[in-house]
């Protein structure tokens, strides 16, 4: 259930609305590490929003009854808040990228490397949220997230001098990190830019 991994409707007073944590304990509460921190992987959380919207769209296109449609609507309701909150926490505007880990207790980045893949994933999440929402403020926020991720990817990761091949990971200082994240050859079924193909399909619709 989404509310186990996210703070929805103020369920946990110690966390902000839309906070999303990576791990839960046996008590279905956020898992605290030895130092008391609660880990959020902003890239995973933002990726989840896009995949959730993709599932919800597919489910609505199937022949489902009214009760199922109502449940789908309830499931979708927290997604814009999660998108906006996690982007606000994880996106590092200077130089531009999404940090690998964030502490939900200390409210600070835990791992400041910024892998490439979280930016196109967040573009898909913002695009689908923009399409699904009827709220003007949410839609405007989605466009801003979409813009910031696009600009960060094009300006900081793509390298025109070598046929637009992208840097895999940047540090928060804007230098190239030796860390290797998910790559197309190691993960051929997913991390190959498929999220951007969904965005292209959105334009076609």
Model-derived regions, located:
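Glycan-recognition and catalytic cores of secretory/periplasmic carbohydrate-active enzymes
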Residues: 1-205
């Amino acid at each position: 259930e989404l509310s186990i991994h996210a703070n929805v409707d103020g369920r946990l007073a110690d966390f902000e609305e839309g906070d999303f944590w990576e791990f839960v304990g046996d008590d279905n509460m956020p898992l605290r590490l030895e130092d008391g921190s609660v880990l959020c992987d902003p890239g995973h959380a933002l990726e989840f929003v896009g995949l959730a919207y993709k599932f919800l769209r597919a489910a609505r296109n199937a022949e489902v009854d009214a009760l199922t449609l109502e449940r789908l609507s309830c499931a979708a309701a927290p997604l814009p808040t999660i998108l906006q909150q996690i982007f606000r926490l994880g996106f590092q505007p200077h130089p531009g990228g999404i940090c690998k880990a964030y502490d939900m207790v200390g409210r600070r980045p835990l791992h400041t490397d910024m892998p490439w893949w979280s930016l196109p994933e967040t573009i898909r999440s913002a695009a689908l949220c923009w399409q699904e929402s009827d709220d003007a403020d949410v839609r405007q926020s989605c466009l801003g997230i979409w813009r910031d991720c696009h600009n960060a990817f094009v300006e900081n990761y793509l390298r025109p001098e070598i046929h637009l091949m992208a840097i895999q990971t940047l540090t928060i200082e804007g230098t190239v990190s030796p860390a290797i994240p998910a790559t197309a050859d190691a993960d051929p079924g997913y991390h190959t830019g498929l999220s951007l193909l969904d965005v292209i399909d959105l334009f076609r619709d």
